[in-house]
Amino acid sequence: SVGFKAGVKDYKLTYYTPEYETKDTDILAAFRVTPQPGVPPEEAGAAVAAESSTGTWTTVWTDGLTSLDRYKGRCYNIEPVAGEENQYIAYVAYPLDLFEEGSVTNMFTSIVGNVFGFKALRALRLEDLRIPKSYIKTFEGPPHGIQVERDKLNKYGRPLLGCTIKPKLGLSAKNYGRAVYECLRGGLDFTKDDENVNSQPFMRWRDRFLFCAEALFKAQAETGEIKGHYLNATAGTCEEMIKRAVCARELGAPIVMHDYLTGGFTANTSLAHYCRDNGLLLHIHRAMHAVIDRQKNHGMHFRVLAKALRLSGGDHIHAGTVVGKLEGEREITLGFVDLLRDDFVEKDRSRGIYFTQDWVSLPGVIPVASGGIHVWHMPALTEIFGDDSVLQFGGGTLGHPWGNAPGAVANRVALEACVQARNEGRDLAREGNTIIREASKWSPELAAACEVWKEIKFEFPAMDTL
């Protein structure tokens, strides 16, 4: 007779362990599970734990060669989602030995690699991860972090201002550089390559880098402030990406940029290491995130992608606006903004935070608010995001009726007015419009901007609710 019982078996016999006490070294995951009709939630939760760790669909004799009890993921708790029929939050604990040190790539391959196509589930969404301190310590994280960035730029006590250069595709390198110069000269701290500007026939990367560097130094000399332009180093291969980052460093640029989801975590971590070793700041764009995080019941929540980026490394990351054209519910957005910036974040289900997360002094990432925002949004943005943020106005700068530099002036005046008002103890939420109006009396550039955008709102109901 065979030494083991062959055949298909219930996952829940092995992988559903409600009495399990989670360890400090476990990676904990909260999955939103929608089982197929007739599949009990315990079985669905156990199936997730099994398929994302040691399980397979049938008993195999090689199971006897290792200790499954030591290596298996376990579903240790299941709770129904309030207000949703047939949706459950399944909590799964993974032993740390299942993961390679310092590899976000491996962490995701294990936790979300195969299980999302699983037939017994109608849909599956990873809502949050608790990353244990012992695992965090194997990552280098952001190349510099918030404090070092402020020291490098010598800018304190206010949010930083940015602008994406538009039209995003089609400008020649020289005209592109000119737009960069005008924005920086007018008072912005940063300008940005669009995420899809890499190295196309109308503007090769090296030409763009040269003209942007020239714009940068000219604006710096004239304003006496340190300026930056996010030079997009994203490329088709890791070698080419590093080549671009090296060129940026040689030109004396302070910051480069990467599309971390389309580029991939392996490339991103390599670039982050290069940036740390060579004193470059790293701006991260989240192109492709909505493919992964927009559906409420399937995929991954952005807070997981944000945590992963903090491990992999980046000094800035786009984080929605709460007020512009791109989605973001206020409490939920602030939840993952705290996860990016703070050293310790308490569990708070009302903000979508399923686990207490201790970052053990890993540097923080500055959230970037970008997308459909303009001067009238400034009080709200200053209040919501606070000082450690980058507020990025693309159309809100370049759409100014008098041109780029006046557009930049308008934004800088609005920002300084909001910061001053806040420091004087005024209530930005209530008095925001008044503050902007008062400031526009002594800034014709701001007055013109207020006039253009006074009616524009992007109001749709948000998708991202708890």
UniProtKB/Swiss-Prot annotation:
SUPFAM superfamilies found in the cross-reference section: RuBisCo, C-terminal domain (SSF51649), RuBisCO, large subunit, small (N-terminal) domain (SSF54966)
Keywords associated with the record: Calvin cycle, Carbon dioxide fixation, Chloroplast, Disulfide bond, Lyase, Magnesium, Metal-binding, Methylation, Monooxygenase, Oxidoreductase, Photorespiration, Photosynthesis, Plastid
Positions with a binding annotation for Mg(2+): K192, D194, E195
One GO location term (cellular component): chloroplast
InterPro entries: RuBisCO, RuBisCo_large_chain_AS, RuBisCO_lsu_C, RuBisCO_lsu_C_sf, RuBisCO_lsu_fd_N, RuBisCO_lsu_N_sf, RuBisCO_lsuI
Enzyme class label: lyase
MF-aspect GO terms: magnesium ion binding; monooxygenase activity; ribulose-bisphosphate carboxylase activity
Cofactor info, note text: Binds 1 Mg(2+) ion per subunit.
Post-translational note: The disulfide bond which can form in the large chain dimeric partners within the hexadecamer appears to be associated with oxidative stress and protein turnover.
Site residues by UniProt (Transition state stabilizer): K325
Catalytic activity annotation: 2 (2R)-3-phosphoglycerate + 2 H(+) = D-ribulose 1,5-bisphosphate + CO2 + H2O; D-ribulose 1,5-bisphosphate + O2 = 2-phosphoglycolate + (2R)-3-phosphoglycerate + 2 H(+)
Active site positions: K166 (proton acceptor), H285 (proton acceptor)
UniProt keyword Disulfide bond, yes or no: yes
Obligatory cofactor(s): Mg(2+)
Signal peptide: none
Residues annotated as binding substrate: N114, T164, K168, R286, H318, S370
Subcellular location: Plastid, Chloroplast
Sites bearing N6,N6,N6-trimethyllysine, chain numbering: K5
One record GO biological process: reductive pentose-phosphate cycle
Miscellaneous: The basic functional RuBisCO is composed of a large chain homodimer in a 'head-to-tail' conformation. In form I RuBisCO this homodimer is arranged in a barrel-like tetramer with the small subunits forming a tetrameric 'cap' on each end of the 'barrel'.
NCBIfam families: PRK04208.1
Annotated function: RuBisCO catalyzes two reactions: the carboxylation of D-ribulose 1,5-bisphosphate, the primary event in carbon dioxide fixation, as well as the oxidative fragmentation of the pentose substrate in the photorespiration process. Both reactions occur simultaneously and in competition at the same active site.
Quaternary structure note: Heterohexadecamer of 8 large chains and 8 small chains; disulfide-linked. The disulfide link is formed within the large subunit homodimers.
The protein's name in its UniProt record: Ribulose bisphosphate carboxylase large chain
Gene: rbcL
